[in-house]
């Protein structure tokens, strides 16, 4: 098995077949809807809030609302009243079962439900998938997080409509340091490994540092890419703004950090400061343009054409050209 990550791989260009990069279509069909980009902001308190979720949904971007200090039923009802997509997160605790039940009994429902725990290859996840499928059979269920083909196969067999791949590769995640486990440092290999056995869509979650990493994720099997740090630190971001040496920053912390949990127990995340980047809409526009450029370099016109390119691994024992692997 090859071991590599985003910084160790470059994609190889093919003959360009468009007159302008703007002809390339980076949109993606994911579940029952089509979205402008194969990118979703991480469902974290310092990345998005209800206001940002509404804006994303209204502008045809995928989102997953976080589950922390949130009245999920009220949020879902508000989105329904505005004719917007309802996409929420769920844990596996009794309170999470109650949320699913309330969405069902109220008739509000949900379009997407993401079961989101640090180690998703668990019986608790199997039970929650079954509960959602029973109570909200029309919902598109995303489950995770996992890091091995064995785990992905199980989640698919348990009924997940998509799986989230990535254990601890994020910028504010310290799972591998605290536990010795994870996909940090080889996230792209883990994605490739899992994609080989997948029969349903994969969300690559974590480790994205540059816009080009989105194209690499699609190349190695991702249908959607979850991004945290690149979406944190915007003017609209919900984190507190602080000034350091005359420069503005926004706080950004992991969902398993003590800042998010409110206690120092089973901590696998940390807090950092992200420079304020400007407006979210500008970042999304730039991501779209960069992904259009990636598709043109792939000799294609649509997102799936990225999966046809060759790649090289830079340095190490696996260095060399790889053909359509």
Curated annotation (Swiss-Prot):
- InterPro entries from the entry? Aldolase_TIM, GMP_reductase, GuaC_type_2, IMP_DH/GMP_Rdtase_CS, IMP_DH_GMPRt
**Enzyme Commission number(s) of this protein:** 1.7.1.7
Q: Recall the GO molecular function terms of this protein's record.
A: GMP reductase activity
| Pfam families for this protein | IMPDH
A GO biological process of this protein is: purine nucleotide metabolic process
Q: Which UniProt keywords apply?
A: NADP, Oxidoreductase
Q: Which residues form the active site?
A: 173 (thioimidate intermediate)
Gene3D superfamilies of this UniProt entry?
Answer: Aldolase class I
Going by the record, the broad EC class of this enzyme is oxidoreductase
One GO location term (cellular component): cytosol
PROSITE patterns from the entry? IMP_DH_GMP_RED (PS00487)
Q: Which reaction does it catalyse?
A: IMP + NH4(+) + NADP(+) = GMP + NADPH + 2 H(+)
Q: What does this protein do?
A: Catalyzes the irreversible NADPH-dependent deamination of GMP to IMP. It functions in the conversion of nucleobase, nucleoside and nucleotide derivatives of G to A nucleotides, and in maintaining the intracellular balance of A and G nucleotides.
Family annotation (PANTHER family): GMP REDUCTASE (PTHR43170:SF5)
Family, as annotated:
Belongs to the IMPDH/GMPR family. GuaC type 2 subfamily.
Protein's name in the database: GMP reductase
Q: What is the lineage of its organism?
A: Bacteria, Pseudomonadati, Pseudomonadota, Betaproteobacteria, Burkholderiales
């Amino acid at each position: 098995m090859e071991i590599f990550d985003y910084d160790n791989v470059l994609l190889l260009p093919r003959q360009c077949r468009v007159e302008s990069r703007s002809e390339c279509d980076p949109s993606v069909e994911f579940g029952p809807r089509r979205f402008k980009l194969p990118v979703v902001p991480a469902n974290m308190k310092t990345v998005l809030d209800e206001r940002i979720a509404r804006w994303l949904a209204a502008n045809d971007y995928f989102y997953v609302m976080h589950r922390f200090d949130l009245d999920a039923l009220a949020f879902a009802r508000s989105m329904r009243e505005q004719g917007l997509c309802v996409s929420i997160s769920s844990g596996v605790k009794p309170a999470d079962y109650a949320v699913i039940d309330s969405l069902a009994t109220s008739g509000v429902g949900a379009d997407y439900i993401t079961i989101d725990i640090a180690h998703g290859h668990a019986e608790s996840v199997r039970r929650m998938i079954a509960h959602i499928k029973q109570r909200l059979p029309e919902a598109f269920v995303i489950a995770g997080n996992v890091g091995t083909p064995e785990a992905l196969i199980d989640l698919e067999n348990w009924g997940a409509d998509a799986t989230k791949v990535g254990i601890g590769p994020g910028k504010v995640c310290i799972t591998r340091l605290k536990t010795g486990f994870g996909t940090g440092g080889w996230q792209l290999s883990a994605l490739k490994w899992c994609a080989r056995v997948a029969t349903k869509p994969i969300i690559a979650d974590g480790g994205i540092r540059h816009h080009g990493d989105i194209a690499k994720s699609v190349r190695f099997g991702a249908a959607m890419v979850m991004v945290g740090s690149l979406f944190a630190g915007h003017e609209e971001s919900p984190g507190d703004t602080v000034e350091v040496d005359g420069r503005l920053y926004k706080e950004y912390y992991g969902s398993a950090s003590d800042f998010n949990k409110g206690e120092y127990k089973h901590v696998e995340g940390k807090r950092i400061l992200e420079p304020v980047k400007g407006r979210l809409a500008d970042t999304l526009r730039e991501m779209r343009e960069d992904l259009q450029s990636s598709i043109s370099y792939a000799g294609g016109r649509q997102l799936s054409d990225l999966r046809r390119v060759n790649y090289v691994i830079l340095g190490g024992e696996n260095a060399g050209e790889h053909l359509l692997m």
